[in-house]
């Protein structure tokens, strides 16, 4: 067992109760996760960080408190050790929304997605009421700098590193012009509370409800952002009919002024283009820099989303021409 975990279990007086410690498949971060099976108690999950932590200043802790106040279901933080860099968390099991969909009936599938969309609407509505600079998400946003950085990440790690694209200075400048037009529009939209990575692998099915995980990077952004993450997911296929129905469901449950569906859909597609390009950058990075090839299987679906949106709008004719050799 990892020595820090052994020390942690001893400090929490769980050593005698511990039956087994099992590593879990992690995410694309530097954290490691372990399930601890306990005698006469529910299992727990330990999140092992790369080094010591400062519990009081961790975004994960603050955002967990914020989302619990919304309220939407998130894992409870049970205990922690700053010195050892460990968080003890409620164990939500292994069934992500992505994993469950293969066994779900059409009725279950629809109900789970409506629940997930309803959580987005609730986070946006209550997120405004709970707004406070005491919570990290209200101090950061999808601004021009962040959105541009993500698109440049796509250029570096997907186009150049993964696809081997040798871009000329003229092509690079043309891409920068296209990025500028996209991000200026997105960054100018009114901002709401966003999870930032709200997709089928970050929604867990536990006790007949969805629970939200991996929320530590929450920030302010367009009202389309989390909906795009869910409905233009790199990990799950949704039909056009399903997407249309869930967008309509979101608009029906959205608070405040409800935009016309056509205009909302245009903004949805623009946000999807930016986010899907960013996802390709992440997949390229994980493959070429981290030697993790598991994400290659999700590239074709993500490319399909990108191609669809580039072809749908005449404004992207030049961008489609620039990217087409590698799409």
Predicted region positions:
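Secondary-structure capping and boundary motifs in well-ordered enzyme cores
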Residues: 146, 190, 195, 219-220, ...
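ATP-binding pocket architecture of kinase catalytic cores
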Residues: 25, 34-149, 153
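Hydrophobic packing residues in well-ordered alpha-helices of helical domains and bundles
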Residues: 60, 109-116, 147, 172-175, ...
């Amino acid at each position: 067992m990892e020595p820090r975990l052994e020390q942690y279990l001893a400090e929490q007086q769980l050593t005698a109760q511990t039956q087994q410690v099992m590593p879990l498949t992690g995410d694309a971060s530097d954290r490691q996760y372990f399930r601890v099976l306990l005698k006469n108690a529910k299992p727990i999950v330990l999140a092992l960080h790369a080094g010591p932590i400062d519990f009081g200043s961790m975004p994960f802790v603050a955002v967990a408190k914020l989302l619990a106040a919304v309220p939407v279901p998130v894992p409870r933080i049970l205990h922690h050790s700053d010195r050892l860099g460990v968080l003890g968390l409620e164990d939500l099991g292994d069934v992500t929304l992505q994993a469950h969909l293969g066994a779900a009936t059409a009725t279950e599938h629809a109900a789970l997605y409506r629940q997930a969309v309803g959580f987005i609407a609730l986070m946006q509505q209550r997120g405004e009421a709970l707004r406070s600079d005491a919570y990290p998400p209200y101090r950061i946003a999808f601004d021009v700098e962040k959105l541009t950085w993500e698109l440049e990440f796509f250029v570096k790690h997907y186009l150049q590193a993964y696809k081997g694209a040798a871009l000329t200075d003229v092509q690079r400048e043309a891409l920068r012009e296209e990025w500028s037009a996209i991000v200026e529009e997105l960054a100018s939209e009114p901002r709401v509370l966003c999870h930032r990575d709200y997709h089928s692998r970050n929604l867990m099915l536990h006790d007949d409800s969805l629970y939200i995980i991996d929320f530590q990077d929450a920030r302010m952004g367009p009202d389309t952002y989390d909906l795009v993450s869910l409905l233009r997911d790199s990990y799950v296929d949704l039909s056009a009919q399903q997407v249309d129905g869930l967008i309509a469901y979101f608009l029906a449950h959205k608070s405040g002024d409800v935009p016309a569906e056509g205009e909302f859909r245009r903004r949805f597609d623009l946000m999807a283009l930016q986010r899907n390009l960013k996802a390709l950058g992440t997949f390229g990075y994980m493959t070429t820099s981290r030697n993790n090839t598991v994400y290659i299987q999700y590239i074709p679906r993500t490319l399909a989303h990108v191609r669809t949106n580039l072809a749908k709008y005449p404004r992207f004719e030049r961008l489609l021409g620039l990217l087409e050799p590698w799409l």
